[in-house]
Amino acid sequence: MSLNLVETPAALRKSDFAVAPLFIERWSSRSLAPDAIPEADLMTCFDAARWAPSAFNAQPWRFIYAHRDTPDWDRLFGLLNIKNRQWAYRASALVFIVSRKDFVFQDETFPVGSHSFDTGAAWAGFALQAHLLGYSTRAIGGFDRKQAPETLGLPDNYHVETAVAIGRRAGIEHLEDVFRAQERPSARRPLDSFVFAGRFHAAHD
């Protein structure tokens, strides 16, 4: 593999139907250029997330972010596990995505069973808008989940969903060998392995 940018998603991915190209072109890179992201670009991504659908219009998503080389960066970056620090240190910004587990309606508090589901929809909007602006995003599940609520200052009725690294995609020469081999768009399962008419088919799992 070249040490330059990897093959385009079009060479590795193919849709069976007329899906808009951005869904296929977006993929999660670890190879990021250490450039600053303008605040306006980051806010545009958050604004896209804002329009996601949610149960009761509760909008349970919350985003906590830090630009690299700012005082908050070290606190957020320190939550990542060692393996993820090996590549995420070059990100332009880190974002922790959090969901609220309840909402208040007419002075009464109700649980929201779909808080994670709805926040996932907001994350998709964030990631797709970032792609349209020329940025790559990668969700990070490997972080200190026990410490994160305290570091982020969360009340008990909030849940940390994921961390996200965002930045311009770069060449892979600075990546560890184990990451270089993985730095390519991933494939997807065929439709008939997860879409069923009328009844679930366990054989496909």
Residue ranges and their predicted role:
Residues M1-D205:
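Acidic, surface-exposed loops and disordered segments
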